[in-house]
Amino acid sequence: LSGGYREWLLHHFEELNAEEVRRYDRQMILPQVGSEGQKKLKNSSVLIVGAGGLGSPAALYLAGAGVGTIGIMDADTVSISNLQRQIIHNMETEYVNKAESAKLSLQKLNDRIEIKAYPHALTVDNAEEIISKYDFIIDAVDNFETKFLINDVCVLLEKAFCHAGILQFEGQVMTYVPGNNPCYRCVFEEVPESGSIPNCSQAGII
């Protein structure tokens, strides 16, 4: 290609500026991504509910990949016991709200995307309004009530979402695509009885 790969992309795809081509060209080389895929990432939005051990790497990689709008929600604050696995936080943000701490890290990684922090919990009162603003939802929370809430609202709004859970050395992940596969409630039916499943502070986590 005359002028090189980057120049060809800039000429044919004006929605991606020169800096974006330099930043993302390693993944744009992949035929499964390309310039069209990168433009889709740029114009997409993802809400991550939970900025802990699951939400941390998810948020970092989505920001690095160039997802145009990332919302991150968490009512908790950073504690030193989080830092062993919640890599989006650091000692400087100890005692800071996790959503706000995550926003600081993501802005340092990629200041060309929009980061929205929600320093509060997802509730029955706000879930539909917030979730409706995003293309894709990531359930990275550590309580079953919120997992079922995310599922039910996403099913209602026909939003695709990814559920994930971790405990000790094990993990679980499933993706719901409206009209394509069973939802979280279809598989697990109802919230487990309180105290029947230990949490990370009781059972441990890597």
Name the predicted role of every residue range.
Residues 2-206:
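Adenine nucleotide-associated cytosolic modules
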